Amino acid sequence: MSWALDEFLSSVEEEFGVDIEDAEQLDTPGAVIDYVAATTKAQDGMDEEEHRDHVAAIVGELMARTLGVTRYREDWRFVEDLRVR
């Protein structure tokens, strides 16, 4: 895994207080979003969909900051489609 992707996943762990043990399985932005949404609790009365949207927004900000990626689809793969090296 690239240092940039490691940095991104570390920032996700820090931001959400989650442990990402099997990073190889999280090969798309959508997989990261789903993992975080499933392992964290919704706050402030959010339902599941609102919680996932909230997580997606933060993950998008972290991707922009650590990877320089600002436009993506959730099913795009980090290495092959987004060219994260």
What annotation goes with each model-predicted range?
Residues 1-85:
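Phosphopantetheine-dependent thiolation modules in NRPS/PKS and related acyl-activating systems
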